Amino acid sequence: NTVCTLRAEENCVFYIAYALYEGVGETLHIRFDPNAPLGPMHEVHGEGTFQREVFIMLGDKTPASRLLCGYTFGPDSGWTSWPPHEHAAMLEETYCYFDMPAPKMGYQITYLEENGLYSDAVAHPVRSGNMVVFPCGYHPTVASPGTRNTYLWALVALRPEDRVYGIYNKDKNYI
């Protein structure tokens, strides 16, 4: 067991992501740097209205049992998690939205697809302070006009060998 004390010197939000610990890795604190150069921790994904910046704070090269996490900053009025994807066979994902105060918002869409048929489609408005958990299904998200989707994402591997960043199944209707 590790004891950790966090102290804020100004108004802030702490995000604490965790997963089952199986003896791999150590407790660590990683300070977010929005000016990090492009490289292993700062990538650009997608193109056009779904291009976004991804900051990988705890990637698969850092020793850990099951956790991966980072931040996504989408374009103004654009899509993130596009094309739609899912990774339920290996990973469960959570999004924690921030820097989207009311009236700004996005829409988190989730749905299942089987044999080319969609089911259980749901769209939820999301903004700062909202958290969405995806145990299964495709989960694209879009920002309303004048808004950027910004969220912390945490992926938890169902098995230690599934702890790999970038493994997902794209919805074949969008390939």
Regions found by a protein language model. Give the residues of each.
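Jelly-roll (double-stranded beta-helix
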Residues: 1-175
